[in-house]
Amino acid sequence: MKLSLAMLALGAFVVAGAVVAVGTPGPTPVEIAGPVVKLKDKSGHGSGVHIGNGYVLTANHVLPGAEKSMAYLRDDGRKGTAKVVWGSAEYDIALMKLDTYDGIAASNLECRAPVMGEAIAMKGNPLILENITTWGRVAGTEISMGPWASVIPVDGAIAGGMSGGGAFDADGDLIGINVGMMIQQLGLGSSSVGISVIVPGSAICGLLAR
């Protein structure tokens, strides 16, 4: 959730010397929505990250099948429509375009793979919650695993609805897209093992350059 800080101008009042110093309020800060959006359709929801000029990165499995657009919700409450530009099932990455992008921050995409032990923050909209951040560290090196051509394991939590959200480094730069978590089958049920996977920025930049 975005925290807006209201700045109050402080003034001093000295009675004995009849000197009054009055602070003049500064301009009201302009509200800028964060870069992570919620993407929704009739079957469910995921997340996406605005990288500039209305373009949003997300996970390919978040896309709505035959439909070419999804509704989106910004963290400032504004809504709109995002259209599919392209998707890669091999890498589980897709690019969408917002119908309007005024007043929304853009993430700086780093074309690199996070390194072992690096601190990482993962943002998205898990389950019934919105604008959630979880923290962890890079737990392994870049690998091909299951349906993903290139992912990096991290020890932070990713839950359903966070797919397509961003993985950010200590400087706030986008270094990956959340795509899944590892599940262990336990009899008739299953349990998360605490390891999630992200597609690294290096692979994403390779797709964008095609």
Describe the residue ranges of each PLM region.
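Protease-domain processing segments flanking chymotrypsin-fold serine proteases, especially trypsin-like
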Residues: 2-43
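Generic detector of low-complexity/intrinsically disordered segments
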Residues: 5-12, 97-100, 210
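Residue-level detection of beta-strand scaffold positions
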Residues: 10, 120, 174-177
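Small side chains
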Residues: 11, 17, 71, 80, ...
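Active-site region of chymotrypsin-like
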Residues: 26-43, 98-106, 130-209
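Conserved active-site neighborhood of the chymotrypsin/trypsin-like protease fold
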Residues: 34-36, 43-45, 50-124, 128-132, ...
